[in-house]
């Protein structure tokens, strides 16, 4: 169990009009912030949690509350993993009618977390009314994101390497309402430790043109971004030697 509470005093500013007349205005009212966290550890490194954040402001301005339930489960061998998050945001006393705006967000994932072959499938969703900016980091809402990770590793040493890792990543994003393409990306990575304990790796990736619906800040418009193809090669000298060296080559091609 965790609980945090903080209180901030009202804040004021002196403003002056064109006639040099000054007046004192309230820029931020008396405000109370609190966070409540309930967490229960379960067998097999599993857990469930409930988090609630609340911001109360005195006077006629709005108040905000966000509640989220999280869960993460593993099987007995810690080989398979699934979990997620369901959250709801409420902004109270907004507008002339003092209505409540309720938003919704969810996240679900499933994967294999041990063994030579591993993978993870993830989906995140947020409607256009979900808002956590009163207490927390907030970028944007109204999206549906899907991602897939697949990896394969060779941990048994051979004649030329000690270990080798290969992974594939893909990402696809849409605006939820109205449903429109936002962005996508795909890349493949390989990393290895050689017999002389040097490390080396390579990566190739591609991102098609994307649509940024937030950048124009004008309803009905969007920013069309470029498509990108890129690659990376790197070699790192053995770290335990007196001198360390790292060579990194990166290629990027962008076009509209």
Cite the ranges covered by each PLM segment:
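Conserved structural-core and active-site-/substrate-pathway-adjacent residues in large, well-folded domains
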Residues: 1-3, 38, 68-71, 121, ...
């Amino acid at each position: 169990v965790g609980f945090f509470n903080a209180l901030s005093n009202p804040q004021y500013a002196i403003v002056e009009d064109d006639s040099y007349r000054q007046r004192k205005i309230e820029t931020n009212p008396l405000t109370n912030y609190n966070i409540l966290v309930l967490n229960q550890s379960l067998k097999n490194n599993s857990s469930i949690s409930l988090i609630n954040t609340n911001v109360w402001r005195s006077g006629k301005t709005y108040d905000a509350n966000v509640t989220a339930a999280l869960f993460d489960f593993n099987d007995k061998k810690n080989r398979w993993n699934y979990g997620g998050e369901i959250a709801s945001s409420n902004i109270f006393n907004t507008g002339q009618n003092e209505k409540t705006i309720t938003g919704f967000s969810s996240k679900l994932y499933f994967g294999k977390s041990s063994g030579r072959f591993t993978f993870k499938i993830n989906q995140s969703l947020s409607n256009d009314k979900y808002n956590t900016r009163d207490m927390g980091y907030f970028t944007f809402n109204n999206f549906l994101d899907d991602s897939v990770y697949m990896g394969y590793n060779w941990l048994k040493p051979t004649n030329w390497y000690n270990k080798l890792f290969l992974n594939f990543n893909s990402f696809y994003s849409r605006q939820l309402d109205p449903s429109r393409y936002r962005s996508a990306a795909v890349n493949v990575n390989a990393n290895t430790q050689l017999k002389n304990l040097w490390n080396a790796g390579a990566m190739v990736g591609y991102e098609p043109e994307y649509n940024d619906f937030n950048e124009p800040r004008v309803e009905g418009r969007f920013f069309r971004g470029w498509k990108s193809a890129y690659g990376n090669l790197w070699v790192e000298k053995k770290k335990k030697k007196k001198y360390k060296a790292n060579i990194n080559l990166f290629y990027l091609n962008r076009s509209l």
